[in-house]
Amino acid sequence: MKHLDRLQHKIGYEFSNLTLLKQALTHRSAAKVHNERLEFLGDAILNLTIGEALYLQFPHCNEGELSRMRATLVREKTLAELAHQFDLGNYMALGAGELKSGGFRRASILADCVEAIIGAMSLDSNLPKTMEIVRRWYEVLLRDIQPGENQKDPKTRLQEYLQGKRLALPAYNVTDIQGEAHCQTFTVECHVENLDRTFVGVAGSRRKAEQVAAEQILKVLDIK
């Protein structure tokens, strides 16, 4: 498993039980034994790790400021960027349909895989060791983050911008839901007054899909 050796070097952790790593890399479209339970565990550990790091780093910030910074650091976009650093797209096991549709590049799948790897590391070792590795992944991001307006989520920032311009609020509509109840993928379209196009967000929940669409609009409007 030379290719997994390379991946383990990139993430900074060597698995004792490679089966856990393989499961973390397996999307539900590829096998009955997949990474969603590991993702659930990894999500909790990630939030704990980043929450603790921010609590210690910013002793004078209130709960709202800490929550917004944590949301920025654990959001899909940030996790997908970490996945690109690890070249996770080259290691994931995807079903034929997901491969054909470019699932190895999809931010939601990459982000879920990062969380699954965190969950797998915790089962392979222990919580303190896993948190230490995650803090190492986030070293630069934690160093650079600061409380402030840019920590608000995309939907909030878009709404405040439109209100400031006295424009109508965005309209979000779910246009498609795929998958079974416990593992659905939502497609959301968003329309904004004075922008002659439709923006589409796809994610594992309606809320996340709306955030993806809102972030696309912010980019078009050049709002940082």
Curated annotation (Swiss-Prot):
Its EC number is 3.1.26.3. InterPro entries: dsRBD_dom, RNase_III, RNase_III_dom, RNase_III_sf. It catalyses: Endonucleolytic cleavage to 5'-phosphomonoester. Keywords: Cytoplasm, Endonuclease, Hydrolase, Magnesium, Metal-binding, mRNA processing, Nuclease, RNA-binding, rRNA processing, rRNA-binding, tRNA processing. SUPFAM superfamilies: dsRNA-binding domain-like (SSF54768), RNase III domain-like (SSF69065). It holds the Pfam family dsrm. CDD domains: DSRM_RNAse_III_family, RIBOc. Its main location: cytoplasm. The active site is at residues 43, 115. One of its GO terms (biological process) is mRNA processing. Belongs to the ribonuclease III family. Digests double-stranded RNA. Involved in the processing of primary rRNA transcript to yield the immediate precursors to the large and small rRNAs (23S and 16S). Processes some mRNAs, and tRNAs when they are encoded in the rRNA operon. Processes pre-crRNA and tracrRNA of type II CRISPR loci if present in the organism. This is Ribonuclease 3. The lineage of its organism: Bacteria, Pseudomonadati, Pseudomonadota, Gammaproteobacteria, Pasteurellales.
